[in-house]
């Protein structure tokens, strides 16, 4: 039995409906410093902070909506870009905070939940993904965000010797973790591909290929092509 229904008009209409519904629902996640968790009641759950990865993902999704021409998405994409350019930034150490409060301080800066929290590759990958997609949508401030996100990737996250991203650092980008996880690497591949699509720089494609090559070669050495989630540098 074939899968010809993938291209059927009714299926495409269903996909479009679900896309619009999800983006409309996601609007409720907006808070002053980014995007929060949405609870089962459709409202922001105040028990959760504003997390970097959620704000990055939301900015990515609304930027896609803007590229698709879905009404209302541009303002939410712009809000995400402003949050990533502003309160979620770590002005002292560089990079971005993992989690902040929903309200800025008196000077408009983000208030980190834990100033000593480690910086994670997983979370920073979504900054790059959001920046690249918002740049493709030509959102205000996105080009500058992409420039800075690429610089942070070059300086800290890409390990040229290992040909893999570093998993995490201390808050001040010291103490790199001797661990390589496929989850963070997977999302880094996604972000690198999006970046290459936007700026045409081959090095991002080459890095993505190195990561996927690592992910494939390890299970090739294991019985049954078993892919372990964790490994060391």
Where are these regions (language model features)?
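Glycan-recognition and catalytic cores of secretory/periplasmic carbohydrate-active enzymes
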Residues: 1-233
